[in-house]
Curated annotation (Swiss-Prot):
It comes from Schizosaccharomyces pombe (strain 972 / ATCC 24843) (Fission yeast). It is an enzyme of class 5 (isomerase). Keywords: Cytoplasm, Isomerase, Metal-binding, Mitochondrion, NAD, NADP, Nucleotide-binding, Nucleus, Potassium. It holds the Pfam family YjeF_N. GO terms for cellular component: cytosol; mitochondrion; nucleus. Its cofactor is K(+). It catalyses: (6R)-NADHX = (6S)-NADHX; (6R)-NADPHX = (6S)-NADPHX. The gene is mug182. Its main location: cytoplasm. Residues 11-221 form the YjeF N-terminal domain. The lineage of its organism: Eukaryota, Fungi, Dikarya, Ascomycota, Taphrinomycotina. This is NAD(P)H-hydrate epimerase. Belongs to the NnrE/AIBP family.
Length: 242
């Protein structure tokens, strides 16, 4: 069975469907997505070896998924630090940050290249939660320099939904300092995006919230999730466009 890919426009439409006919709130979807991310991290990078995790969050919903994941990772025994140089103003994001503050999880809300380089040296793993399916290049600073520093550091990276800087429907950058950005692990959310056809590493799918009604409406072919897991391993599984 091939697994369906969702283009950027189809992913946007499906999200809208989930929050209208599907009756989900953005809070619910973000919580479930972040929980999936945390489970993928735990599967691949156990806290006994990768306790120091640097979670790089962008200003949108993908960054919100990272904020949620940080809270769950703390509960699993990790020592997360959140790098959030362009924090979002909506109340939802403020509440997510307050939850992290209450757990004494460091949240860095401004960019300093030297400080970021030190955080990279102090970490075992980066969770790339910067850009999601709505990304369109070019990558602007501070995120361009952040991603370039991650590439240079050679640290292990898990990307959320799509590797940041990759064009959602076309794949990785073909030139420039970010052409070598290629995470070790990818967790697609809801369904893989077309760029994941170019991805050759460990690949998980998360977002166990798509109903049969929506699956049928969008003509999706998605794998079953085992047991109570919020992620399923789809490494090397064939992918096809809807």
């Amino acid at each position: 069975m091939s697994i369906s890919c969702l283009s950027a426009s189809a992913a946007k439409a499906l999200d809208a469907e989930l929050m209208s006919a599907g009756a989900f709130s953005i809070d619910q979807l973000m919580e479930l997505a972040g929980l999936s991310v945390s489970q993928a991290v735990y599967r691949e990078y156990p806290p006994s070896q990768y306790s120091q995790v640097l979670i790089c969050c962008g200003p949108g919903n993908n960054g919100g998924d990272g904020l949620v994941a940080a809270r769950h990772l703390w509960q699993y025994g990790y020592k997360p630090t959140v790098y959030y140089p362009k924090p979002s103003s909506p109340e939802l994001y403020k509440r997510l940050c307050k939850q992290l503050d209450d757990l004494d999880i460091p949240v860095v809300k401004s960019h300093d290249s030297n400080h970021f380089s030190q955080l990279l040296r102090d970490s075992k793993l980066v969770v790339d939660s910067i850009f999601g399916f709505s990304f369109k290049g070019p990558v602007r600073d501070p995120f361009g320099s952040i991603l370039a520093a991650i590439v240079e550091s050679k640290i292990k990276v898990l990307s959320v939904d799509a590797p940041s800087s990759w064009e959602i429907d076309e794949g990785p950058q073909k030139e420039g300092p970010l052409k070598d950005f290629d995470p070790d692990t990818l967790i697609s959310l809801t369904a893989p995006k077309p760029c994941s056809k170019f991805y050759k590493g460990k690949h998980y799918l998360g977002g166990r919230f798509v109903s049969k009604v929506i699956t049928k409406k969008f003509n999706l072919s998605l794998p079953p999730y085992p047991g109570i897991d919020q992620v399923v391993d789809i490494t090397n599984k064939p992918l096809s466009m809807v």
